[in-house]
A protein has these predicted regions:
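C-terminal structural segments of small proteins and small subunits
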Residues: 67-93
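Short Gly/Ser/Thr- and Asp/Glu-enriched loop/turn motifs at secondary-structure junctions
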Residues: 24, 61-65
């Protein structure tokens, strides 16, 4: 089982990820794009990062809006360093 990150560590790490928040034991962020196509290009890029890192986000998409949630299933659905690694990778796509 993966080791979850403490609330203090989460707050420290979130300071380096503008727009990301923590609630309900998940990291979360919403993105707005110009149109649906741009949102889908972003989601496709996320899919490659998720596969590369072997860590997969929760994704919600409606037209030009994308919502990402991150939690680690094999850490009892808590936040781990894997979630922050994927969040940083997602941010690097913009």
């Amino acid at each position: 089982m993966k080791k979850s990150v403490t609330h203090l560590e989460i707050n420290e790490k979130l300071s380096e990820l503008p727009g990301w928040s923590f609630s309900n034991d998940q990291l979360k962020k919403s993105y707005l794009f110009k149109n649906f196509r741009e949102a889908m290009v972003f989601l496709t890029a996320i899919s490659y990062e998720a596969e590369r890192l072997d860590h997969h986000p929760g994704i919600y998409n409606c037209f030009n809006r994308v919502e990402i949630t991150l939690t680690t299933h094999d850490a009892d659905n808590r936040v781990t360093e894997k979630d922050f690694t994927l969040a940083r990778a997602i941010e690097s796509l913009l």
